[in-house]
Amino acid sequence: AGKMSIRIERRLDRVFRKIEESTSGDIHPTVRVESGSRIIEIPIKDIVVVQAIKSSHLVDIYTTSQKIRIKETLKNMLEKLGEEFTYVNKSCIVQKRLIREINKKNYFAIMSGGLQVEISYREMRKLVKEQ
């Protein structure tokens, strides 16, 4: 019953987010995450990078102002965040519009705020095509 209720909750979150977006142009869509005992609403526009932590079911969410560690998979985060985000390697997703520079020779991107992320060969080819 646990997995089913989580799936239903996620779908409801998406439905409510779509309703919010369509009813008010000035409301920025948010993603709701749980970090320990806290429930946090993060504006999606503020999320720069989401990085998986090796050998754990945790991810670090880097926003324009803070880092939040939550128990979640990268795949689920990408699903929640939508098409503005993309994988740059198997353990990291970024918000595409916040990529400030791509270094094709050394395979990394510099994000808004100066955060540097590694880009895999495969993802580099996709990113360069999209830019």
Regions found by a protein language model. Name each.
Residues 1-4:
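Contiguous mid-protein beta-loop-alpha structural module that forms a pocket-lining wall or clamp
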Residues 7-112, 116-118:
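Conserved binding/recognition cores within well-folded domains
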Residues 129-130:
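Tandem repeat protein-protein interaction scaffolds
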Residues 126:
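Alpha-helical DNA-recognition elements
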